[in-house]
A protein has these predicted regions:
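Polar-ligand-bearing catalytic/cofactor-coordination segments
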Residues: 2-322, 338-414
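Alpha-helical transmembrane segments
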Residues: 331-335
Length: 414
């Protein structure tokens, strides 16, 4: 161990302590408010539904707290515990050469990480979601999803890893810039291809066939100047009772998707209001802003890695004795979240700001009152807590807390 080892452990300890403290605040706040529905929701949400949401939030937070400790121990095991060094040495014995060995190392490491997360995924799906009446996933579907995800990782990940390691080896001291261009291109390609190629591997998508709703939606799209490949309904009920809607794709491949569970919950005017909110993200260019932000972050990260890769203390401080490009990449991907935790509340704040902007747009194109009714139904059906801890919410939540969001929309109903 060297000085950087202690810096890493200190940062990890501070990060873990902060997250555990926030989780404790969330648990205490939700439990303290479990016995009473907030006044703003007293007429629309019954105490039983409110208590279910509180219990669901508490259960998920408890599991999340356990995962925090588990993942921190795994990270120490992978790094200072010698896990990565051992796995790399195992692949080196085959004598395949630098790039093939690096690709095998990257792919196997990510597969092992996924397997180590499997117990939590199984427990969440088949115990927690089942207990609260949300789970519709069968063991066969769960296994099928895992197999598809693994196959996709191999089909997409192996060529990407090979190209990345080749650039790191062959393109000189500016390899990080070329790798960033590769990553940017790949990310944009995936964003474009996801709706039409990847998502249908996991869910069935059908065009909305309700003529009355189609007419209302098309009228809204025309008012907003939005052209898409269609309004789709996804068979979300095949896996879960949760409902949602989202905007996906880019260019000529833009789509708006409703979960079938959501369409069963909301009335036509409420669906129109939810769609107006999603269109607000499009009109306010939130997707483009997020893409640019992520691209700049990845550029800064790769530039930093371009310097770290030459520093022996970086490897030795994280339990690696034989430096290599693929180990530098793995170490950076695994450890950087520990040192960038301060960005989490900043990104959450920007995301909540975008949600407010989308709500404001929806209030001008549809009805704020309809959107409020839709949100209340979604909070109820998804068992979303109405009383999150303010600091926990500020740190993590991508959407404004329910009372704050509804209060904001209420100012737009006049």
């Amino acid at each position: 161990m060297n000085t950087f080892s202690w810096i890493f452990l200190l940062a990890l300890g501070v990060s873990l302590a902060l997250k555990l403290w926030l989780a404790r605040r969330q648990l205490q706040n939700v439990a303290a408010n479990r016995g009473r529905v907030p006044d703003a929701f007293a007429d629309s949400i019954q105490l039983e539904a409110h208590q279910k949401a509180a219990d669901y939030t508490i259960t998920n937070t408890l599991q999340g707290r356990l995962e925090l400790v588990y993942n921190s121990l795994l990270l120490v095991g992978w790094t200072l515990g010698g896990g990565l060094q051992w796995l790399d040495s195992s692949w080196q014995q085959f004598g395949w050469g630098t790039i093939p060995t690096g690709v095998a190392m990257l792919v196997s490491a990510f597969l092992i990480m996924a397997l180590l997360e499997l117990p939590f995924s199984l427990y969440h799906t088949f115990v927690i979601e089942e207990r609260f009446g949300f789970n519709k996933t069968t063991p066969a579907t769960f296994i099928g999803d895992m197999a598809k995800q693994a196959l996709l990782m191999l089909i997409l990940g192996v060529p990407l890893a090979w190209a990345a390691l080749w650039l790191m080896q062959e393109s000189g001291h500016l390899w990080w810039l070329y790798l960033w261009l590769l990553w940017a291109g790949f990310s944009l390609l995936m964003l474009w291809a996801y709706p039409a190629v990847i998502a249908p591997l996991f869910n069935k998508f059908t065009l909305l066939d309700d003529e009355n709703l189609q007419h209302r939606i098309q009228s809204l799209l025309d008012r907003c100047g939005f052209k898409s490949r269609g309004i789709y309904v996804m068979d979300g009920s095949r896996r879960s009772g949760h409902g949602n809607a989202y905007f996906t794709g880019m260019g000529q491949n833009k789509r708006i998707v409703f979960f079938d569970t959501l369409l069963k919950t909301l009335e036509a005017d409420e669906i129109e209001a939810v769609l107006a909110h999603e269109l607000g993200h499009f009109k306010r260019k939130h997707v483009q802003k997020r893409i640019v932000t992520m691209m700049l972050m990845s550029l800064a990260g790769l530039a930093l890695l371009g310097w770290l890769i030459e520093q022996n203390w970086f490897y030795q401080g994280l339990g690696v004795q034989q430096p290599s490009n693929h180990l530098a990449l793995l170490l950076f991907l695994m450890v950087s979240p520990v040192f960038t935790i301060f960005l989490q509340p900043l990104f959450s704040w920007f995301s909540r700001r975008h949600e407010f902007e989308a709500d404001d747009y929806a209030a001008t194109q549809a009805s704020a009152a309809d959107l409020i009714r839709a949100l209340v139904k979604m909070y109820k059906e998804n068992a979303s807590t109405l009383t999150p801890d303010p600091l926990y919410s500020a740190f993590y939540d991508s959407h404004p807390p329910a009372p704050v969001r509804v209060a904001h929309l209420s100012t737009k109903t006049g």
